[in-house]
Amino acid sequence: MGEFQRNENKHKSWQQFFLYPLFFREDLYAIAHDHHLDRSGSSEPTEILVSNFLSFLTVKRSIRRMRKQTNSISLFGNSDPNKLIECNKNFYSKSILEGFTIVLEVSFAMRSKHFIEGMNGWNSLRSIHCLFPLMEDKLPHSNYISDIRVPYSIHPEILVRIFRRWIRDAPSLHLLRSILHEWKNSFSRENLQKALITQIENTRFSLFLWNSYVYECESFLIPLIKRFFNSQSLLYGSFPDRTHFDKKIKDIVLFPRKISTKKIWLLKDSFIHYVRYGERSLMALKGTHLQVKKCRYHLFHFWQYYFHLWFQPYRICSLQLSKTSFSFLGYFLHVKMKPLVVRVKMLDDLFITDLITNELNPIAPIRAILFFLAKEKFCDISGWPISKLSWTSLSDDDILDRFDRIWINLFHYYSGSINQEGLYHIKYILLLSCAKTLACKHKSTIRVVREQLGSELFTKSFSKEKFISSSFSKTRSQRERIWNSEISQINPLANFWQKMQNKQIEN
């Protein structure tokens, strides 16, 4: 009886790796069908949506055909001259792809859950602003930073090899291979590799491929880096009494006589911190220039030999924090030395000494924000506010609410920057653009609009309750910053500026 239970448990554990029974469940494709309808909304004609009914028998037949690469259905393109039939096939193929993605997501979630449970000290936070307090604490103690852009030029067979680690059934792998190779034939050779990750039409499948790829990278890369920096030590540089601290190390740590105290500093005081958002990763290092070069060397060879792809040199850049600034999540980040006056009392004597500390200064890119506002027709190139003509057909409340949301989102995202005066200038531009838009709609002047609306223009739009008052801003310390914990994604303005930075680096 015990042997039978062991065999049954073994059969259940092996069955978790087989996904093909889920492909023949009708409720799975019903969920995918409803998900696709929710995403499409009312953008498609009603007659096309009505004609797309879900057939369980046709789903099974289509999957059986998709397993054969020589006779697979088209998931990413149709050449049928009948527009209605073409839309139906395209819509139905997307439903199959959504169902396949749901199956992979469930299996991936189970695998990643066990991986996260096995890691000690793993914290998952939703807000991206949780990265900035971490960098405020850790970056001032670092002297080098490596700005890494995760490469996305990966071959489809490498993705199949990644999934083969936790998918044991051949039909699911053949289905995935046929989808990826059909995707490969649907794009030009130049845009193929980027389309595998950043294709717009199949967002759910694309995001799943990207997350799986990044998960595979970090699951091997982070332990490799931890092995390279084998010990996480205290920040000895933060202690004023450095001489006596070295003497304590000498008494505690056993080391050969040939190694001097300076070499102990290099060996024991090395640490690394890693953060990532999207394709951008930052590794802050406390060590020597030789250690940074070795880490860069290992990163190059990791992607070259493990993923069989060429890692472009511009995708990893090592900077010295005390000399240069870098951009991340729409901020300019710069570590600046700050002197502190400290009073030390010894017996009856009082001494005044100076301490040099490092402080992280996040700066909002005001020029990039002005360029974006000029592109969206809120102001001209010189920063002079203009009316938003495309919004004149809206009601007054909608116009005020739209300007209000733009400003609130912008200020909440850049609330931790040190150049708050630039944000006040952006507020002035949006306020005048809002007034000019209302004046253009009512065919009047800004003065007439302000007289008609009165304080409503300033209370409903850009309300003072949602903005930090000037009295509080003056009384608070310059070292204190307010990071909004409700920011779950990068601001569109910051994302636009970040894409401009990436294009400049690639060119």
Swiss-Prot record:
One of its GO terms (biological process) is mRNA processing. Keywords: Chloroplast, mRNA processing, Plastid, RNA-binding, tRNA processing. Signal peptide: none annotated. It is found in: Plastid, Chloroplast. GO terms for molecular function: RNA binding. Pfam families: Intron_maturas2, MatK_N. The keyword Cell division does not apply. GO terms for cellular component: chloroplast. InterPro entries: Domain_X, Maturase_MatK, Maturase_MatK_N. Usually encoded in the trnK tRNA gene intron. Probably assists in splicing its own and other chloroplast group II introns. Belongs to the intron maturase 2 family. MatK subfamily. This is Maturase K. It comes from Cryptomeria japonica. The gene is matK.
